[in-house]
Amino acid sequence: MSDIHEHKILILDFGSQYTQLIARRIREIGVYCELWAWDVTEAQIREFAPNGIILAGGPESVTAENSPRAPEYVFTAGVPVLGICYGMQTMSEQLGGKVIQGVGEGEFGYAQIEMLTDSLLFKGIEDAVNSEGKPLLDVWMSHGDKVSAIPEGFVAVAKTDTCPFAAMANEEKQFFGVQFHPEVTHTRQGMRMLSHFALDICGCAANWKPSSIIEDAIERLKKQIGDDEVILGLSGGVDSSVVAMLLHRAIGKKLTCVFVDNGLLRLNEAEQVMEMFGDHFGLNIIHVDAENRFLDAMKGEADPEAKRKIIGRVFVEIFDEESKKCANAKWLAQGTIYPDVIESAGSATGKAHVIKSHHNVGGLPDHMELGLVEPLRELFKDEVRKIGLELGLPYNMLYRHPFPGPGLGVRVLGEVKKEYCDLLRRADAIFIEELHKADLYNKVSQAFTVFLPVRSVGVMGDGRKYDWVVSLRAVETVDFMTAHWAHLPYDFLGRVSNRIINEVDGISRVVYDISGKPPATIEWE
């Protein structure tokens, strides 16, 4: 079996919103990489032993006092280095070049760079050719400052009308700098550039692929767990489902899954989870029907934050009770993924590889005294999904829209009652079913229904009725940090509204939420 961690790239984070995207792109190319804060020590870099280093972008100005710098060792480690945006500027400054503060001359958005000379990084890449026969590339810029003089040993590789050094290179030392962002899709040939860097320049082999990751994970799980038993909180979400499948392959019946039905799930979700994991895949599952316990605990509580805490607390209590029944369990499995690890790391002393475990199940009690098993902690969400497919989980389950941890507890506004949850479940199922029918489900990033604790007058037949209101919500987004409301066709919305009002007794009015994020959040609570 090839070692999937043998070849690796280190990415130093200077605070750019795109840094995780760089890591995901390198992984897509088939090379393992890790993301660390910029102030990593020489000893830590030596221990990691990367085949190449990427200096990512960042919001600071290199010209400002105390702005972040790459460790000096980066440039003496004897491995290729790629500086992106701020990364190029700090590379230039640290190696004897010059950076000037942008005064109204920054480049933001689409730009076309003109290639001035050949470089390994840009080998065979062009989007167009200008009248002088020089290759042109379509790229995405986002910078105010710019390099005004490059360090000794470097050459200018590309320019724009306002930026004389859009790319620079020292081919001998294999140091490269680009002022644009190759990791974003708007840079059309960005993946090819990153591929040149990781595979050709750094000499990495493309060993990082789903089948190899699964093989490696199973091997490591067997080694870590031995003959012990493991307990896992299975929610039916992507992460816990993939963890369950990996562990099932690694240790079989020594895995016990605890599935807690809190009464806040989607229509028929509990039955689907039990059918798929219990009947179809043959996992050992304890099914806890705790609907009344959760609803009783939330009785009279309307505050969203308080509801979240109650749901988290009750889950932990139940999980604790059930785990005591598994007296032989020595390990607790969790669906911690790489972005959780990065969030926990921070800067200065918290490099992503030395952080404390990230408890993603709402703080399990310390007295459980179980070892932690986190087979997904190196993976991004898109990688987890690809692994899930390889393990035989259905596509529509792995790629369905996000569902909040507290479930309908934060989609029923105000106090949560069984009646409200039942109405909301049915209305939401109609909305999702119609999105699939109209081939719109995968065209929006997230769609759901919200229950409003408001009664509204309606007319049914000859009589009037005074029933509840629901709101439909659908958004389009790339990263869920910002989002546009989805412009769904009027006739589609009309069809959904008609079906809900006619088929769900107790709902008299349907509205559509046309708020963007910001100022609104995607979820209502």
Swiss-Prot record:
All copies of domain Glutamine amidotransferase type-1, residue ranges: 8-207
One term of GO molecular function: GMP synthase activity
Keyword Ligase annotated: yes
SUPFAM superfamilies found in the cross-reference section: Adenine nucleotide alpha hydrolases-like, Class I glutamine amidotransferase-like, GMP synthetase C-terminal dimerisation domain
Alphabetic keyword roster: ATP-binding, Glutamine amidotransferase, GMP biosynthesis, Ligase, Nucleotide-binding, Purine biosynthesis
Reaction catalyzed: XMP + L-glutamine + ATP + H2O = GMP + L-glutamate + AMP + diphosphate + 2 H(+)
EC numbers: 6.3.5.2
Pathway membership, UniProt: Purine metabolism; GMP biosynthesis; GMP from XMP (L-Gln route): step 1/1
CDD domains linked to this entry: GATase1_GMP_Synthase (cd01742), GMP_synthase_C (cd01997)
EC category name: ligase
Ligand binding (ATP): 235-241
InterPro entries: Class_I_gatase-like, GATASE, GMP_synth_C, GMP_synth_GATase, GMP_synthase, GMPS_ATP_PPase_dom, NAD/GMP_synthase, Rossmann-like_a/b/a_fold
One GO cellular component, as annotated: cytosol
Keyword Transcription set for record: no
List of catalytic residues: 85, 181, 183
Domain GMPS ATP-PPase residues, every copy: 208-400
Assembly description: Homodimer.
Function: Catalyzes the synthesis of GMP from XMP.
Annotated HAMAP family: GMP_synthase
NCBIfam families linked: guaA_Cterm, guaA_Nterm, PRK00074.1
UniProt-recorded name of the protein: GMP synthase [glutamine-hydrolyzing]
UniProt source species: Shewanella baltica (strain OS223)
